[in-house]
Each structure stands twice: as C-alpha cells, then as structure tokens.
Amino acid sequence: MSKIEQIAKDLVMPILEKNNFELVDVEYKKEGSHWYLRVYIDKEGGITLDDCQLVSEYLSDRLDEVDPIEHSYILEVSSPGLDRPLKKPRDFERNIGKEIEISLYTPIDKRKKFEGELIEFTGDKIIILYNGERKEFDMKNVSLVKPVIKF
C-alpha cells in the first residue's frame, strides 16, 4: 500500500466504523493524464449511493485538511462490485456455499483455473466442491479468487 493509500485508509476508517461499513480496498493510481484515489466500501446487504456520498464527503473534507496529495486527483467512493476478488477471510466466509473461480500460479492436473462451490476456508486453504469431490487449494498457490456471477 502506498503512502497516500495508507493516509486515505487512516482518514476514512472513523466514518466506516461509525456506520458499520467495511473497507474493501484503496487504490491511488494514474490513468491517462488523471490521478484517481478510489475507495471501495461494503456492508451487509450492500452499499447504497447515499452511503457512498456520506463517505466521499467525509473523506474529501479530511483530505482537504491534511492535504497529502500535491496535484489534482479524482476521489471515487464506490462498492467493489459483484465480481470483486475475494481477499479477506470475511470475503470467503460470506461466499461459503456459492460458486467461485480460483486462479493458480502453478497448474494442478495441467489446469490453472478451477470453478466450484466454496465449502470451506481455513486461512491457509480453500476447499471447493469440484465435479462432486472436495478439492483443496493452498493459498500460497492461489493468485486470484472471485465469485462466479450467473444471470
């Protein structure tokens, strides 16, 4: 996490804690000629536009006070989206019983992607139901885990 991302995280936490929101991620990066500070938040039942506005106004005021960014930037506060990667233990817990896709660094059985129902997460291992059988994946070999969205 960059220094600016850490500052933004520290500044936003009080409003998140007060409202029982979860900080999913903070990004500070340049895209084209513009800099973006993106804050992704969530809560049980999902984030609303009003929630995003509340956090955005609060964080904008705090950033103006501290002024840690020398140049102009665009502040965005939003939900992480339905297909956000699962990173934290809580993300995995929320997705028990749901379909996920696992991408690996090193292939297993000549495959680097597996899809199945998440049945357990231990912190070190992900266990899914794959083709009717339990399959374990060591987190050290997992590059990405995301929910499977079916419409």
UniProtKB/Swiss-Prot annotation:
SUPFAM superfamilies: YhbC-like, C-terminal domain (SSF74942), YhbC-like, N-terminal domain (SSF75420). Keywords: Cytoplasm, Ribosome biogenesis. It comes from the Bacteria. It is found in: Cytoplasm. The keyword Cytoplasm applies. InterPro entries: Ribosome_maturation_RimP, RimP_C, RimP_C_sf, RimP_N, RimP_N_sf. Pfam families: DUF150_C (PF17384), RimP_N (PF02576). GO terms for cellular component: cytosol. The keyword Nucleotide-binding does not apply. GO terms for biological process: ribosomal small subunit assembly; translation. HAMAP family: RimP (MF_01077). Belongs to the RimP family. PANTHER family: RIBOSOME MATURATION FACTOR RIMP. Required for maturation of 30S ribosomal subunits. This is Ribosome maturation factor RimP. It comes from Thermoanaerobacter sp. (strain X514).
